[in-house]
Every structure is written in structure tokens, then in C-alpha cells.
Amino acid sequence: MHTLEMLLLVLLLVPLAPGEGDGQAVGGDRNPSEARRAYKRLLQRPARRMDRGGCTPCGPNLCCSEEFRCGTSTHHQTYGEPACLSY
């Protein structure tokens, strides 16, 4: 058999990859209400205690490491809030 024929034979014998057509949601296939529940569950987790060793306090819940400086965010969603800036 030629190489091309062997390759086609192998491709015909290989089953579908897992996740393809087996009914399981992957990535973008997730139900929006399921994603919302997961996000709310994430928000309800207790906050971790901040380790302020070796950093500069830059707001009530923000601590900048030594290579960054305190400033205000220019991002459209967090404009004017405290932020760690690299310049």
C-alpha cells in the first residue's frame, strides 16, 4: 500500500476524539445559568489574607510589590480606582 492509502485507512479507523459529539459541554458550550452559578460561587469564597511583607499598601485591598508603584487605573472598567503601575 502507498503511504497516502495507509494514512486514509488510519484516519478511518480512529474514533472521534473525546468531547466531540458525546454530549459533554466543553468551553463555550456551557449553559449561561451554569456559568452564572459558578461565578457567584467564586465570589462567595472567603477572601485570602494578604501578605503585606515586601510591598507598599496602595488601598484597602491592594498591595503593590517593589517593582510597581501605586497609582490610579486608566482601564475603562476600573477607571480611577487604586492600581499597581509598572511605569
Curated annotation (Swiss-Prot):
It comes from Conus caracteristicus (Characteristic cone). Keywords: Disulfide bond, Knottin, Secreted, Signal, Toxin. This is Conotoxin Ca6.2. GO terms for molecular function: toxin activity. It is found in: Secreted. GO terms for cellular component: extracellular region. Its main location: secreted. Residues 20-52 form a propeptide. Expressed by the venom duct.
